[in-house]
From Swiss-Prot:
Membrane topology (UniProt): Single-pass type III membrane protein
Protein name listed in UniProt: Matrix protein 2
Regulation: The M2 protein from most influenza A strains is inhibited by amantadine and rimantadine, resulting in viral uncoating incapacity. Emergence of amantadine-resistant variants is usually rapid.
Residues with lipidation of kind S-palmitoyl cysteine: 50
Subunit structure: Homotetramer; composed of two disulfide-linked dimers held together by non-covalent interactions. May interact with matrix protein 1.
Family classification: Belongs to the influenza viruses matrix protein M2 family.
Gene3D superfamilies xrefs: 6.10.250.1640
Transmembrane regions listed in the UniProt entry: 23-43
Length: 96
């Protein structure tokens, strides 16, 4: 039930809750979305360093070298370094 659909009214000297149309599919969907949003926000605040560090560094990695022999990796590094050395007028940073 959403707080927007609940109305508190005094009933027989007690405070009760009179909920109108709480079975409406739109109200149910809005409640589910609200709860999911709250959960995701809490997780984001708890783990934001891990999450954003993964996206920041994970996307900068370049091609995967898994299963590639070390000699080919070294050859690739030399090619990348020669590409940097060829253009002395501009500084180019390549992270491997």
């Amino acid at each position: 039930m959403s707080l927007l659909t609940e109305v508190e009214t005094p009933i027989r000297n007690e405070w009760g809750c009179r909920c109108n149309d709480s079975s409406d599919p739109l109200v149910v969907a809005a409640s589910i979305i609200g709860i999911l949003h709250l959960i995701l926000w809490i997780l984001d605040r708890l783990f934001f360093k891990c999450i954003y560090r993964f996206f920041e560094h994970g996307l900068k990695r370049g091609p995967s070298t898994e299963g590639v022999p070390e000699s080919m990796r070294e050859e690739y590094r030399k090619e990348q370094q020669s590409a940097v050395d060829a253009d002395d007028s501009h500084f180019v940073s390549i992270e491997l």
